[in-house]
A protein has these predicted regions:
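Active/binding-pocket-proximal capping segment
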Residues: 147, 282-284, 305-306
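C-terminal intrinsically disordered, low-complexity extensions immediately downstream
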Residues: 304-313
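Small-residue-centered hinge/linker elements
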Residues: 1-37, 49-51, 59, 63-172, ...
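Amphipathic alpha-helical substructures
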Residues: 19-46, 51, 270-300
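Beta->alpha turn/N-cap motifs
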Residues: 54-56, 302-303
Length: 313
């Protein structure tokens, strides 16, 4: 599972036993007592860090490695670094053979402002269309870090990706920390899917939620009433109880959406529907487990996905 992958990675990177990592996690109180209450010393004793330095001493240590420019560390700013490395084809003869990278980060919504916590489907669709119309871009890598969101918005993105594939441009999905529910919906048809071992993915399912404050209003003596031309004319009111008819409509709609999700995954992953149903029902999987059950093709990072896209292009 994710915990085993994480502790193994820490142990390997620090060249220590996994038991030492587990002891730090499970018995930190004892380690802290042994270190006289000094958390930094307890971390050093557990070999999770190489040394303890003040900020100034650390700066001097870095200076010994990278050198100095007068009184400043010898280095470049982050923006300057990006300016040099932003174009992977810079300095090569492959200017007309580019791999596009599309980032889908945050909850998936139909429209509205984008940002760290929001993946705007309208903006993403426009970007995918630009990649489709750009003759220099031969394939697209979609980096997904999303817990999902609107099923409708997810389908808009998936349809545009399908249009990109239809003109002969492969799509490779690269999963970050989370690629679940709608995040998997948009990825299921990809030509290849890469995940990190600790990625949380799957969550093949749909749910609906209708907020209701009628009991809260009752508690303070406020009642809602009204007349309508038909039983469903009032829509889904937050101040009244859902009718049995409305509940039935919601349930049927959700079940239909779930069936579509199952069909989509079965088609995209070339799996029988029964096999998808067995691993669906909203359950989440680590990247390692997802590889075993066929939800992803390879374990790897963004660079691995880009390399695969280049092979497919």
């Amino acid at each position: 599972g994710i915990w085993q992958d994480m502790t193994s990675a820490i142990a390997q990177n620090r060249d220590i036993a996994v038991d030492g990592v587990l002891r730090f996690a499970n018995d930190f109180d004892q380690l802290l007592e042994n270190a006289g209450g000094d958390g930094a010393l307890a971390t050093l004793d557990s070999q999770l860090v190489d040394g303890l330095l003040t900020k100034n001493a650390f700066r001097e240590k870095v200076g010994e490695i990278v050198g100095w420019q007068d009184t400043a560390l010898n280095g470049i700013g982050f923006q300057s670094y990006l300016a040099v490395h932003s174009d992977p084809s810079a300095g090569s003869d492959a200017q007309d053979q580019l791999i596009g990278v599309l980032t889908v980060q945050g909850g998936i919504v139909e429209s509205g402002a984008g940002g760290v916590d929001v993946a705007n489907a309208e903006m993403l669709v426009d970007q995918i269309r630009m990649a489709k119309d750009d003759d220099q871009i031969k394939a697209l890598v979609m980096r997904v870090d999303s817990p999902g969101g609107s099923a409708f918005a997810s389908e808009l993105i998936r349809e545009e990706l399908a249009a990109l594939q239809a003109v002969g441009k492969p799509v490779v999905a690269s999963f970050g920390p989370v690629a679940a529910s709608g995040g998997y919906w948009i990825s299921a048809d990809a030509d290849a899917i890469y995940a990190e071992p600790t990625t949380i993915t799957g969550s093949i399912g749909i749910f609906g939620l209708v907020p209701n404050v009628s009991r809260s209003l009752d508690a303070i003596g406020i009642n809602a009433d009204g007349v309508s031309s038909a039983p469903l004319a009032r829509g889904l009111s937050v101040v009244g109880e859902l009718s049995e008819q409305a509940k039935k409509i919601l349930q049927l709609s959700i079940e239909h959406g779930y069936d579509e999700f199952i069909d989509l995954v079965a088609t995209g992953r070339n799996m029988p529907k029964a096999s998808v149903e067995a691993i669906a029902q909203g359950r989440v999987w680590s990247g390692t487990a997802a590889l075993e059950i066929g939800l992803v093709d390879e374990l790897g990072d963004l660079e691995d996905a880009i390399a695969r896209a280049a092979e497919l292009a």
